[in-house]
Amino acid sequence: MWSRMNRAAEEFYARLRQEFNEEKKGASKDPFIYEADVQVQLISKGQPSLLKTILNENDSVFLVEKVVLEKEETSQVEELQSEETAISDLSAGENIRPLALPVGRARQLIGLYTMAHNPNMTHLKIKQPVTALPPLWVRCDGSDPEGTCWLGAELITTNDIIAGVILYVLTCKADKNYSEDLENLKTSHKKRHHVSAVTARGFAQYELFKSDDLDDTVAPSQTTVTLDLSWSPVDEMLQTPPLSSTAALNIRVQSGESRGCLSHLHRELKFLLVLADGIRTGVTEWLEPLETKSALEFVQEFLNDLNKLDEFDDSTKKDKQKEAVNHDAAAVVRSMLLTVRGDLDFAEQLWCRMSSSVVSYQDLVKCFTLILQSLQRGDIQPWLHSGSNSLLSKLIHQSYHGAMDSVPLSGTTPLQMLLEIGLDKLKKDYISFFVSQELASLNHLEYFISPSVSTQEQVCRVQKLHHILEILVICMLFIKPQHELLFSLTQSCIKYYKQNPLDEQHIFQLPVRPAAVKNLYQSEKPQKWRVELSNSQKRVKTVWQLSDSSPVDHSSFHRPEFPELTLNGSLEERTAFVNMLTCSQVHFK
């Protein structure tokens, strides 16, 4: 028996070290299989959320799971588990959850890891001194009475010498009898770690905004706004965070959020992306039209109206502008945030009509043919903003003097012409918002609106600017922060997007004063409340957490027969989930 265990420890350590060395060389990414039933992967980011109370964000850890079953077996398991609920903070939106190992098997693997690192085990065929490997964390199936969902082991090193190991046990239960006494927790921590003083630190998270997933036919939105508060000391369990807390807003917004007021502007951006993709790839996937009339009819009516006018005066421009954006009026009235520009020029009004009605390349060619013919005949002399470098603007300016270049409407030219006027229009829309709200100056926005880069790059930057606008509008509508906070958020977003590609999954963090947001949380119940107990040895913790959704993405929980507890104060009743982290130190010498 002992020889078999020794050999298992040697083999497990050797395989972990091989993976560790390959990862350092950048050669290993996929999990490796150990003894047919276990898969192991070394990760440094994307750690399960429940472990982030223990690990630093960029800590490397070995993540141990059960091997994913073959397709046939997996489908059978999924059928059996179809009515179970397991909400994942790590992989929201995915249908396949990680597979957990039986608790007994997990303990065996933790034992092998600990045994291999023990310098007293000199009989093992492991080169001395033993190389310290990253922590090992094993997903557990919660089959024991305590509901263990994670087991972990982390080495204690002193001057690169392994001195011991910290063993972690993380449990999760769906339990109505979640009451816990703070003093009892402190007493247990003191006894476990033989200390006389304990520090308690509190944490609470409030969900300020989450999209309503009312339509099962579309993918759920990932828009969320939460408020995190932390404080010390903690006076009682489920304490409302005091005004002396450290607070931060966490904001993640998906463009096109239905409860925002930018649906029409977002559609214009989507149409812009369609044109850009068509130029880049040669394939154009047109959007469904907003208008019942054909694009050609729509543009012909527009030109006829202009042709009847002796001059294109301000009052007419305003009437045309209102007509062009009437389907967005309800959103504008609702928000009172975005003032529709009253100075749309000919090209911008043309964009509004064509972006809502064009459904084919032939539509583009016919519409631009009609426009160029009207310009050549002098039927219209449209008004334009200064500063545009679009091809259509150049042709219009030439038409003022009775001589226009001949432009063949073939290849990507029609796409490029419409893309250019769309870029001009959207840039002015965004500038109007940021400047009028005093959230950014033209200098701040120069990176996003500069015409000195390629058209494709301009599209990417405008897309970033739109995402910033979506973030701000969600906050203005539902959080109503003070102007100084909005300004700080704007500058933070601008700084991020000057250095990074578009990422709608990115969470923007904004430090805030609790007094400035107290109305958002003091009368509410948190979606997550946690207390962390520690002593002078900060690595040794006891953590108790209550949440209104399971933070474990690989287990289902038996729900006892009781009316489910409402933790978040909504009309919808939910089960409370209690997590408990305990740890113990084992010293090798």
Curated annotation (Swiss-Prot):
Subunit structure: Component of the RZZ complex composed of KNTC1/ROD, ZW10 and ZWILCH; in the complex interacts directly with KNTC1/ROD.
Pfam families to which the protein is assigned, alphabetical: Zwilch (PF09817)
Coiled coil: none
Entry's Gene Ontology BP terms: cell division; mitotic spindle assembly checkpoint signaling; protein localization to kinetochore
Family label: Belongs to the ZWILCH family.
Keywords: Cell cycle, Cell division, Centromere, Chromosome, Kinetochore, Mitosis, Phosphoprotein
Annotated protein name in UniProt: Protein zwilch homolog
Keyword Acyltransferase: no
Species annotation: Mus musculus (Mouse)
Chief location bin: nucleus
Positions where Phosphoserine occurs in the chain: S88
Gene Ontology CC: one annotated term: RZZ complex
Function: Essential component of the mitotic checkpoint, which prevents cells from prematurely exiting mitosis. Required for the assembly of the dynein-dynactin and MAD1-MAD2 complexes onto kinetochores. Its function related to the spindle assembly machinery is proposed to depend on its association in the mitotic RZZ complex.
Disulfide links within the chain: none
Subcellular location: Chromosome, Centromere, Kinetochore
Gene3D superfamilies from the UniProt entry: 1.10.287.1880, 1.20.58.730, 2.20.25.230, 6.10.140.520, 6.20.270.10
